[in-house]
Amino acid sequence: MSSIVIVSGSRTAMGGFQGSLSALTAPELGAAVIRESIQRAGVAPDQVDEVIFGCVLSAGIGQGPARQAMRKAGVPDHVGAVTINKLCGSAMKAVLMASDTLKAGSANIIVAGGMESMTNAPYILPKARGGYRMGHGEIKDHMFLDGLEDAETGRLMGSFAQDMANTKGFTREQMDNFAISSLKKAQTAITEGYFKDEIVPVEVKTRKGVEVIDQDEQPLKANLEKIPTLRPAFSKDGTITAANSSSISDGAAALVLTTEEYAQSHGLNTLAKIVATSTHSQHPSEFTIAPISAIQKVLERAGWSVDEVDAWEINEAFAMVAMAPIHELGIDEAKVNVHGGACALGHPIGATGSRIILSLIYALKRLGKKKGVAVLCIGGGEATAVAIEI
């Protein structure tokens, strides 16, 4: 069976909440990276067989967000599209589904990734259709309800992270130091231009004219000195804060996948080969440590040891999520999120899964290394992982 390869990819800069990308919808962000990734792959839009794209906060966007994005990108109407909602794992699941579809021989070229405008997530009136009749009504935040809260208990994801940080014995200082390190790495990556090859510039109309957004918004704005002074976010005496958590963000990332045989026969350059994938599920309250088992599974399938991996992208939904497998599996922290993670760059929930794969590829290329693993936790108790080789 022919291996599955990634022949191109791109991402937008990560915009802050109500920040640089707030004027754009998720499909508009998605369109930018779909268009750019197809162009970088050196294929025509009509050669694409399917677009599989993650988007979690789809209320108010309109029918078929992935279909909207591909049409805005100039992909012809005969190409199908599907929108994936696997919470924070949506974009990585899109890549996994693309890989499986290609393995099955049901397609030759698939664009997979994700998009999210958390800024534009609407508020919801749950009882409006039946009528409020009398008294005060309730308004719900789509971002919280469908993105950041546990469906059964209504608890915020961060409260579970706080519980697990307590269980694992991670201190406030340890998590703050991890977040500060992430910020410093991201700041260096931005100032040194390490992200330039990943990012497609996006035009945003403002009152002053058209502004080109081509740089991650949040890392250079962060004040590192304030991090140790921030108040706990999820409990009075807690240790998790806004700084050692990922920030609410907007953005999109896409990858173009095909088989190694197709790439060779059509003269397409290969960025990376997908060596193995995995998913893991456990109790919803334990989602923050699900990446540990997902990593173990993907390494077993790849036939790799922990030490063989040259670089890791472990999504920093919270600093402790990345810290847990580092401590549990003996991962060299110097190999983790080498250009910074979500504590610094942000976490547009429907897009991060493909963003970290793309960032991993370019980090490996810059470092002259070969093997990498990308993994992220998912609300509901799950995690997904991908092992790639340059």
Residue ranges and their predicted role:
Residues 1-61, 65-69, 73, 80, ...:
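Conserved active-site "lid/cap" helical segment
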Residues 1-25, 139, 224-289, 293, ...:
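Condensing-enzyme catalytic core mediating Claisen C-C bond formation in acyl metabolism
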Residues 10-12, 23-24, 29-32, 40, ...:
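N-terminal extracellular/periplasmic Venus flytrap/periplasmic-binding protein-like
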Residues 55-109, 151-156, 221-247, 328-355, ...:
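Conserved catalytic cysteine-centered active-site region
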Residues 84-116, 165-194, 254-261, 326, ...:
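Active-site-proximal alpha-helical scaffold in enzymes
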Residues 109-163:
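Flexible glycine-/small-residue-enriched beta->alpha junction loops
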Residues 159-162, 198, 205, 275-344:
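Active-site pocket-lining segment
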